[in-house]
Swiss-Prot record:
Residues 401-644 are annotated as: PtdIns(3)P-binding and localization domain. The gene is setA. Keywords: Glycosyltransferase, Secreted, Transferase, Ubl conjugation, Virulence. InterPro entries: Glycosyltransferase_domain, GlycoTrfase_DXD_sugar-bd_CS, Nucleotide-diphossugar_trans. This is Subversion of eukaryotic traffic protein A. Residues 1-400 are annotated as: Glucosyltransferase. Gene3D superfamilies: 3.90.550.20.
């Protein structure tokens, strides 16, 4: 049996037999919930919440905060101010709504507040019932004195112009509602499994871009999660993929009215543009006042949670969060008043044709100018080639920071040409000197716990990729880890010695013959790689205009035509340009393209994104599946009947 219900301006085809309160209408508790964890709520959001409280005196208006990390003095003043406006402030830690997964994310050095809010709203509603609202939704009219919802649970549609999913910016439910409780349990598991949605360990230390953070949040805890979890629970009609959900928006306005007639109540988002303000990439408050030892202990607890709950060991990520900023550098329009000793300060010119000035900051915080050539026509920062890390490495290798040699200046100048930062990223952070030492201390602390040491062995993907770094840092592996590898390496070396002693002159002749054949085949292999690159780029061009949720970037073709392609495809196109300009070999370009495709495929594989632009998903899968050596060898075999 199916029923169509109209509410919040949308209609949803629901399987009533799978609903816990089938055939019932439940009254929504008279509470309006807002969430603001981290820093103190900005004034513009306070005004919005205050208006809700003023226009709905019959409802209890609540703002949920995190007293563990909010600035204490500012929070006390905030609580008093809200009390004067008739608004209650509650602490998530005291009310039993802050699960371990939520605390884990909040304790990160740069928490994803969007994910935290997604998880909190479900737990709060499960515990107290009522209405959850994002703090940027304006109130144009009061709520009705009584609101009854079919089965005690309602969601709003996606508010950014999409037409195929739900949203979680407005949620209504009755206290103890079983649907919301199941969603609260499921969202925690989705968060714990979030690393399957992230990039691989190889990229754990790279700065997460805004687009990546948006995608991960939407898919792991946001609207994408809601839609697919409700389908999984059997609440949404599964006769078709997306056709089960329909709604009608009135000029992007939310309808809070149970009737089918013209809406009486409209609630309009304060900002109807997707500016990602709900996923800020900022340090949590108070982190600057914590001692290094306190931050280290916090990191140990976070790593333990990851190992026990997610089965992943992200040592590199936490080491970089704790990195010591020595021999660091920053970019500024003018001299910073807070200079750090033993660092570099790069002053950008006020106009595009001006000269970049590099200073070395000594122990006394004195600026020592480092002469540099005039830098013009700087290339846009490439996230793949990572010139920031290259530039930092060059700086750390300068023999005399105050008086670098002419050769060192030339190298730094070349690195600067690749270093044109984005206008909103003057302060760029990478692997600072000291991360290796921190990684070593973290490793020793974690592996000193026998239980964690045993669990680390089960973190196959992360642990395997960590082994080379462990050897490089001279760290002690967990007991028994790597023994088989070392034994295998010893056996291989013995076999090599025996082979070298028995080859003789015939072996030498054969070696020369193979070498000649290899040289003759080199050009053919390069041609095969070139053809493969051309094929990939033709597929990229076909993606013109096929943009997904995160938008795209424009690129100019050789014929002058400008195409607008998805972000991952744009990065692949950038590698193609570098290959054409001789900056990358064919094999290096292909390796980078495949790597980008694998990362993009991980983001795009979620059904929520893949259904928006299936051509993009198919392209990423195709490139990601390429086995470079096998493909080139197979092509050469087909053409020449030879095995390379």
């Amino acid at each position: 049996m199916y029923k169509i219900y109209s509410y919040l301006g949308w209609r949803i085809d629901m399987k009533t037999e799978n609903l816990p309160q089938a055939g019932q209408e439940a009254q929504i508790d008279k509470k309006i919930h807002f969430i603001w964890v981290g820093h103190i709520m900005p004034q513009k959001n306070i005004q919005v919440v205050s208006e809700w409280a003023e226009k709905n005196p019959g409802y209890e208006t609540i703002i949920w905060v995190d007293k563990k990390i909010a600035p204490a003095k500012e929070l006390d003043l905030f609580i008093l101010d809200m009390k004067s406006k008739g608004i209650t402030v509650k602490d998530i830690n005291e009310e039993g709504v802050c699960r371990d997964s939520i605390r884990h994310e909040l304790d990160q050095e740069s928490p994803n507040y969007g994910m935290v809010s997604d998880m909190l709203r479900l737990n709060i509603l499960a515990a107290e019932g009522g209405i959850y609202l994002d703090s940027d939704i304006l109130c144009s009219a009061p709520f009705p004195d009584e609101i009854y919802a079919p089965f005690g649970f309602l969601l709003s549609p996606w508010s950014q112009g999409a037409n195929n999913t739900l949203c979680n910016d407005i949620i209504l439910c009755s206290k103890g509602n079983q649907i919301i409780q199941q969603l609260a349990d499921a969202i925690e598991q989705s968060y714990i499994a979030r690393d399957s949605f992230e990039f691989t360990h190889e990229y754990a230390s790279m700065k997460e871009t805004k687009g990546e953070r948006i995608a991960k949040t939407l898919g792991v805890t946001g609207p994408g999660f809601l839609f697919h979890q409700l389908k999984k629970m059997g609440i949404l009609n599964d006769k078709s993929e997306m056709e089960a959900i329909h709604w009608e928006l009135q000029d992007q306005r939310y309808l809070i009215d149970g009737s089918v007639k013209e809406p009486d109540y409209f609630y309009v988002p304060q900002n109807n543009t997707n500016d990602a303000s709900w996923v800020p990439s900022i340090k949590r408050p108070g982190i600057e006042n914590m001692s290094f030892q306190e931050r280290l202990e916090n990191a140990v607890q976070l790593i333990a949670f990851d190992i026990q709950k997610t089965g992943l060991f992200n040592l590199d990520h936490y080491a970089n969060e704790l990195k010591v900023k020595q021999n660091s550098w920053c970019i500024a329009a003018e001299t910073s008043p807070e200079l750090k000793p033993d660092s570099y300060l790069l002053i950008r010119p006020r106009d595009k044709t001006g000269e970049w000035t590099l200073y070395y900051v000594d122990e006394d915080k004195k600026l020592n100018p480092v002469t540099l050539p005039v830098i013009k026509g700087a290339i846009k920062l490439s996230e793949v080639s990572d010139p920031l890390r290259k530039f930092h490495t060059l700086l750390s290798q300068v023999s005399d920071p105050v008086n670098p040699t002419a050769h060192e200046l030339k190298q730094i100048g070349r690195a600067l040409i690749e270093l044109k930062p984005r206008q909103d990223e003057w302060h760029c952070k990478n692997k600072w000197s000291g991360a290796e030492e921190i990684a070593q201390e973290l490793w020793q602390r974690i592996t000193s716990n026998e239980t964690l040491r045993a669990q680390i062995k089960q973190c196959f993907t992360q642990f395997e990729s960590l082994k080379p770094r462990v050897a490089e840092l001279g760290l002690t592996r967990a007991s028994g880890a790597g023994t088989e590898v070392e034994a295998h390496e010893s056996t291989v070396k013995e076999q090599e010695i025996i082979s070298q002693n028995t080859v003789g002159e015939e072996g030498t002749k054969e070696k020369n013959s193979v070498q000649l054949a290899s040289e003759n085949s080199s050009d053919e292999k390069i041609k095969t790689a070139h053809d493969l690159i051309d094929e990939i780029i033709q597929d990229v061009i076909q993606l013109d205009g096929k943009l997904g949720l995160l938008g795209g970037n424009t690129r100019q073709l050789e014929d002058g035509r400008v195409i607008n392609i998805p972000n991952g495809a744009a990065m692949i196109f950038d590698d193609y340009k570098k290959y054409k300009q001789g900056e990358l070999t064919a094999e290096s370009a292909l390796e980078s393209m495949i790597k980008i495709a694998k990362l993009s495929n991980q983001l795009n594989r979620h059904t929520f994104f893949n259904q928006r632009q299936p051509e993009t998903g198919q392209f990423y899968k195709k490139v990601a599946a390429i086995d470079l050596q096998t493909t080139i060898a197979a092509e050469y075999d087909n053409n020449h009947g030879l095995r390379i």
